[in-house]
Amino acid sequence: MYFTFYNCSGLTTLDVSSFDTSSVIDMHSMFYNCSGVTTLDLSSFNTSSVVDMAYMFTSCFGLTTLDLSSFNTSSVATMAYMFYNCLGVTDIIGVDTFDIGGLNSTNDLDNFATGVTLPTARYDALLLAWEAQDPFDGMAPNFGSSTYTGGGAVAAARASLISRDSWTITDGGVA
């Protein structure tokens, strides 16, 4: 499904609910620059075989919320620029449950969510869950203007990603 809807900026609606994605391994740039689309129902997507989700939603300006709670990311090897420049997105449901164990290069999370502002509770949950996975060292994810809860377990998890895993995290700082 590599580049399936790439640069379809004129689309306003898109029904992908009947797509069989059970054998798909590449979703790179699938919805790249679908800037007019305001909602996407991806609840039927089977992503268990997907290896590449880089640039998948880049520049999807019209989206405000994405529900990816059904995504299985255990096989994914790159998520770089996945939500880059999704300036209207204010929540990515399920992102905090992503399995990032398959990421094994320092650039696999580059500019992951640059331009996005996740709710503090979602970003907190992401930091806690991803730190617990003991991820690949040296990554530099950008979480846009997302802010985290200062002090306690969340701040400790973020600090661990930076010190133990040598991550360079860009975000909006303490809420």
List where the protein language model places each region:
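Negatively charged
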Residues: 1-175
